[in-house]
């Protein structure tokens, strides 16, 4: 019997998190992708504190987005989370794709964050 896609994603994320850790100097940019929206957080794992966050549900983006589950929304979220992180003095991050494949919406978010000035 095959394993459902969500379980596969969770399994990949557990494997990935063994090697990734956000520090105060270089926090973790975590991405969560649902069927309807996309979410991104910049997290300091040492202090267990979220430093910056953005999603396709943000008031800043909601009016300009027709759909929260496409590459355009991911690009907008990537730019917004990068802008918020840079405003707090964060230049470098560790990218945590959340067990999702680096393709499509996750890739669009990562590339937009890089273009906006985050280094990873």
Curated annotation (Swiss-Prot):
InterPro entries: Ribosomal_uL18_bac-type (IPR004389), Ribosomal_uL18_bac/euk (IPR005484). GO terms for molecular function: 5S rRNA binding; structural constituent of ribosome. Residues 1-25 are annotated as: Disordered. Residues 1-10 have a biased composition (Basic and acidic residues). One of its GO terms (biological process) is translation. Keywords: Ribonucleoprotein, Ribosomal protein, RNA-binding, rRNA-binding. The keyword Iron does not apply. GO terms for cellular component: cytosolic large ribosomal subunit. CDD domains: Ribosomal_L18_L5e. The keyword Nucleus does not apply. It holds the Pfam family Ribosomal_L18p. It comes from the Bacteria. This is one of the proteins that bind and probably mediate the attachment of the 5S RNA into the large ribosomal subunit, where it forms part of the central protuberance. Belongs to the universal ribosomal protein uL18 family. HAMAP family: Ribosomal_uL18_B (MF_01337_B). Part of the 50S ribosomal subunit; part of the 5S rRNA/L5/L18/L25 subcomplex. Contacts the 5S and 23S rRNAs. This is Large ribosomal subunit protein uL18.
